[in-house]
Amino acid sequence: MLQLARFYSLARTKAIHSHGAPFRPEYALKCGLEIHTQLNTKNKLFSQSTNSATSLVDAPNHHTSYYDIALPGTQPVLNLEAILFAMKLSLALGSQVNSISQFDRKHYFYGDQPQGYQLTQHYRPFARGGKINLSKELDDIDESAKEIGILQLQIEQDTGKSHYTETDKDVITLVDLNRSNVPLIELVTKPDFSDIKQVRAFIKKYQNLVRHLHISSGDLETGAMRVDVNLSINEYARVELKNLPNTSSIINAIKYEYQRQVELISVGDTSSLMEPETRGWTGSSTVKLRSKETTIDYRYMPDPELPYINLAQDVISGVRGLMPQLPDDIMRMLMKKPYQLSLKDAKILTYNSNQNDMYNHEALRSYYLDTFREFSKLAGERSNAKLPTNWIIHEFLGDLNKLQIPLARAKEILPPPVFAQFLKLLHEEVISATSGKMLLFHILENFKQSNCQDLSIPDFSKLIEKFELHAINQVDPQELMDLCNDVIAQHTDDTFIRNLVTGKKKSSLKFLIGQGMRRSQGRIKANEFEKKFKEILNIQW
């Protein structure tokens, strides 16, 4: 890779400070990443074939054109959507998009590369520079702030897949070219990582960025994102690690390779560390694949069939003006007034894991923000910022997941203004939290039972009256006394009561309050139960 060896020889070594990692300050790690990301374009990079590289259901070689299988006489036609996606990622990373870039042929022979070469950008990459900033506040690293520099981004085409089948006499290789010519972006970082936490945080942040920009699924498990690691210790030669299918493999491979090299250095056996080499990860150890002596000469040359990519500055500026707000900025906004979300809740509204079919982070964030604004109008200055957070992110989402109702459908009966009215009932203590949970679940359950066809907006007043969910403002003292005594009578264990009264197990009081709330169907407030239980049991703490 261009400039990579020079950066590894010049980068300043740093001491390792990683909790739980087997790193020692006297053996300083320098680490960089090469990340290949498949782009979610409609078509492939140089043909009109459908881009379905990560599909697990398509028949082999179903999405291929004459060009994808390298039929003689076919020529590449550049997919401009891939250029747009590359521009969006480059701008999000703060990279310098080159006004002129070009494609080069990287020559090698392998069964899943029918052309005999791969089209990449060796001499004039698409973009250079840029960075991703990590912080203790948002990314759980040990340093207060850490900048990971980007060397370059380049566009290239993916290869096909080889499948191996063993027979009694031989090993048969089957080639699937559905993935051949799928557009990739290769991102190369500087060797700025000095511990495991930084690597893990970077991968997670980069995954979320490409999902946030809608340019890739970012999934390691499907091969939509593939990561190679470059590392060295104490200025010895760089080792490249390959075959890393997921984040845990990446982390474990770095740990193993670090320990392997430390053991060699500590006993003075450093001859094998003097020259760069490539090693593969088996799942439990790294094994040598090739050394400098066996490195392939790719014989790079400019592709004569493709013109330069020439981007005018007004095109770059136009795309910059269409860029969405970036995840870190969104999270910091959500964690400040008026929203005041916790980091965990802010990430739920910002990070897209691709693992939840009920909602995506953008739709959920939009619903939350719209509801928050509507609730603030209704409640005025007395509005409680935590109420929309708790009820949307925790209760509402929990019900949607339990009932398997997509957010897009639930919004039809509970649009933000209606959900804000529901929050107002809780805010003004017309209903208790327990009654609110029952009411919300009842509304969604009925909607589910209608196969999401009954789009009637719920009438909260009628439902509250029907199910007698009104909070009791004037509690009958005798009724409350009887309820509390009944709850206490269910616990004949003297140790339970004694530990509660002495304060040895204060949490037991919350348990009793919960029992009372259930018996009253949430109509009697928790603080009423707390006062009465303390009175009956003579609790002094």
Swiss-Prot record:
One GO term (biological process): mitochondrial translation
Keywords of this entry: ATP-binding, Ligase, Mitochondrion, Nucleotide-binding, Protein biosynthesis
Location (main, coarse): mitochondrion
Statement: the UniProt record of this protein carries the keyword Ligase: yes
The keyword Ligase belongs to this UniProt entry's keyword annotation: yes
SUPFAM superfamilies per record: GatB/YqeY motif, Glutamine synthetase/guanido kinase
Pfam families: GatB_N, GatB_Yqey
Record's subcellular location: Mitochondrion
Family: Belongs to the GatB/GatE family. GatB subfamily.
Misc. comment: This protein may be expected to contain an N-terminal transit peptide but none has been predicted.
UniProt xrefs under NCBIfam families: gatB, PRK05477.1-2
Quaternary structure annotation from Swiss-Prot or TrEMBL: Subunit of the heterotrimeric GatFAB amidotransferase (AdT) complex, composed of A, B and F subunits.
Summary of the function given for this chain in its UniProt record: Allows the formation of correctly charged Gln-tRNA(Gln) through the transamidation of misacylated Glu-tRNA(Gln) in the mitochondria. The reaction takes place in the presence of glutamine and ATP through an activated gamma-phospho-Glu-tRNA(Gln).
Protein's name in the database: Glutamyl-tRNA(Gln) amidotransferase subunit B, mitochondrial
Species whose genome carries this gene: Saccharomyces cerevisiae (strain RM11-1a) (Baker's yeast)
Gene behind this protein: PET112
